[in-house]
């Protein structure tokens, strides 16, 4: 039976290869670690592998199956162009009509010394086109007007700043020392004029403080009395249901019943009964009360 290519995809073939090697290892070794086993014995067989295997051959497509009309008819190749209008090869030169591999050795002789100027000009043109500024970075031309600065006309004169003169002085600022007239005696520099601080335009409002509440005033909040802490009544718990015996209580009750010769109780709140004690005699108490009231004289 001739060989046929596998019908599975690449992930399927990889999975089947891994499963085959895994089960092959499990057939003769029971360590359970296939990868660790290979890593442990790999250093011992580094030089025994031999030369590397040859690269896999290219797989060619299988011929198409024959249809009802016989084998498929392939179109004949295009005829070569007539005349000397054949496409030039990349190898260039006079031997362009020869074998296609003949121009590989003459790749260095493709351009002559007379073509260097054209190559440098083309490279410079490409460099200039690459460095040309784009449309978004174009400088502003003379015909384009700049944006005007927004200026607001104040409706009311500005108020002077507190604690000194205004920020901008009305007098122009000097940038150089004035020239001295000929024959004039130098005078002492006048003392710096200090401008007193401008008084406040309005009187400050008085600070309002909360009036102190009297000691016996009824407007004071009542004192807070915290509720007493809750203390559970351990001796007489206020529960509707009777407390049941635990395992330890049952054992203690059995020991007490055997010690005092009495029956066991079912609930801890029940009173114990002692049948061997003498019964209390039943007595009927009868008495007569007589009194006499005397009126005051």
Curated annotation (Swiss-Prot):
Residues 106-117 have a biased composition (Acidic residues). Residues 46-229 are annotated as: Disordered. It comes from Torque teno virus (isolate Human/China/CT23F/2001). Residues 65-81, 219-229 have a biased composition (Pro residues). It comes from the Viruses. Residues 137-151 have a biased composition (Basic residues). This is Uncharacterized ORF2/4 protein. Signal peptide: none annotated. Pfam families: TT_ORF2-like. Residues 90-100 have a biased composition (Gly residues). Residues 184-201 have a biased composition (Low complexity).
